[in-house]
């Protein structure tokens, strides 16, 4: 997992509340257990005017010109600004996979569904919670200023606006440690690889009949 330290990125405003995981990545694209291949179908039912299918050539599909991610001013955005209860619905881990592969490293919203929130940290995506009033102000500023960027410093737990105003956010210390060091569940386990091997060797000597 790629470490998350400091980043400055273009902000895309998704002005919708209660965005569920089926809207983030529709169910027909969930047949793969790989972590890749989901970015092109992020928000598929909103980005395109037709119904997408796995393996389809998206370059030939008709785009929805009104959807925010299809607007030229938001191309290359790495910060997604959202409304309350983002990521609700089913527990599919494909949702943060799709957001990450599309290019988003950060989501900012007033609240999240618990499972999506937890899955995001485990997959290198930082879900920042800010008060609703601060999120409202960010929406106003993003929509009024083309090329609007935010600077996020995970170590300092700050979001800095272009006007210099600094917004603080809370994050669990363990989750912060994992993101800063690029540690997913596998990475955490591998940190104890020597101890695991030592235990297995000792157990094999104590209970040899189990390994015959």
From Swiss-Prot:
Top-level EC class as recorded in UniProt: lyase
Subunit comment: Heterodimer of LeuC and LeuD.
HAMAP family: LeuD_type1
Taxonomy, superkingdom: Bacteria
Keywords, comma-separated and alphabetical: Amino-acid biosynthesis, Branched-chain amino acid biosynthesis, Leucine biosynthesis, Lyase
Keyword presence, Amino-acid biosynthesis: yes
Function text: Catalyzes the isomerization between 2-isopropylmalate and 3-isopropylmalate, via the formation of 2-isopropylmaleate.
Pfam families: Aconitase_C (PF00694)
Pathway assigned in UniProt: Amino-acid biosynthesis; L-leucine biosynthesis; L-leucine from 3-methyl-2-oxobutanoate: step 2/4
Catalysis performed (reactions): (2R,3S)-3-isopropylmalate = (2S)-2-isopropylmalate
MF GO annotations: 3-isopropylmalate dehydratase activity
EC code(s) of this entry: 4.2.1.33
InterPro entries from the UniProt entry: 3-IsopropMal_deHydase_ssu, Aconitase/3IPM_dehydase_swvl, AconitaseA/IPMdHydase_ssu_swvl, IPMI_Swivel, LeuD
Segments crossing the lipid bilayer: none
A Gene Ontology term for the protein's cellular component: 3-isopropylmalate dehydratase complex
Organism from which the protein derives: Pseudomonas aeruginosa (strain UCBPP-PA14)
CDD domains in UniProt: IPMI_Swivel
PANTHER family to which the protein is assigned, alphabetical: 3-ISOPROPYLMALATE DEHYDRATASE SMALL SUBUNIT, 3-ISOPROPYLMALATE DEHYDRATASE SMALL SUBUNIT 2-RELATED-RELATED
Family affiliation: Belongs to the LeuD family. LeuD type 1 subfamily.
GO biological process, one term: L-leucine biosynthetic process
Name the record gives this protein: 3-isopropylmalate dehydratase small subunit
